[in-house]
Amino acid sequence: MENKKNFYIDGKWVAPKSKQEIKVINPATEENCAVISLGNKEDIDYAVSSAKKAYSTWAFSPKEERIRLLEKLYENYKKRWADIAAAITTEMGAPKDFATKLQAGTGAAHLKSFIRYLKNFEFEKPLGEHAPNQRLIYEPKGVCALITPWNWPMNQVCLKVAPALASGCTMILKPSELAPLSSMILAELIDETKFPAGVFNLVNGDGETTGNALTSHPDVNMISFTGSTRAGALISQNAAKDFKRVSLELGGKGANIIFKDADPDAIERGALRCFRNSGQSCNAPTRMLVEKSMYNEAVERLKKYTEN
């Protein structure tokens, strides 16, 4: 069982202030695969303080410097692709081929996309032909709290971390305590890439203690959260106290709705989409509503398909 108790704060791996720990379970084997620490308010205070300090210089870093570092991060990511995929297989039970091609692959794709977008983005430009002397200026928001789910670890992490780095924000990442291992590899890559200390920080933990301390911290300017509707509501309450900007992606699990005149393969296709990613995707159609007249047929076809 791996020891993954340390956090990445202020450009180094540090021992947590918290003494609370949790075991990470491989859902495919139901065996313990690692132990992590659950951060407390002191750990969050340290991480936010480091991010706030780094923001004073990172926010004004040249676009060319951010591009250089992101391109280096992308190259380092590709070198550890297999390690990232293996970590995802371990922490969430994803099949190896799926973890390699899609789970780790989407993380790399997001990095590449935001690098391309940053190269073409203008942080300052004329407001328009009607106001040639007025400027439209885009500024980084500040210290960001990034909280990600367990079902698409690198997809969600890179989708939040990459644009934050590109825009000049600093951040504290709290990955899901159920699937933190791939995120810790990303922290290693950011360290290897030599981003300035404090720009990126990682604190593992749960929602009740760690997440609450992070989203209610007065020096956090923005929160990006993907997860449950209940947690999103609590985060919104914390954010409202000092008007933090909030980006929420909540809920999921929509139903298949299939009528008698639907595509003949709709039932089998719905089952395939249900089981993809071990059934853990937010858009996995894990409920199937069918026209009453074809209920028995649908049950038999699903049974035959899933037994194959």
Question: What is each residue range found by the language model?
Answer:
Residues 48, 70, 85, 107-108, ...:
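A general structural signal for well-ordered alpha-helical segments in protein cores
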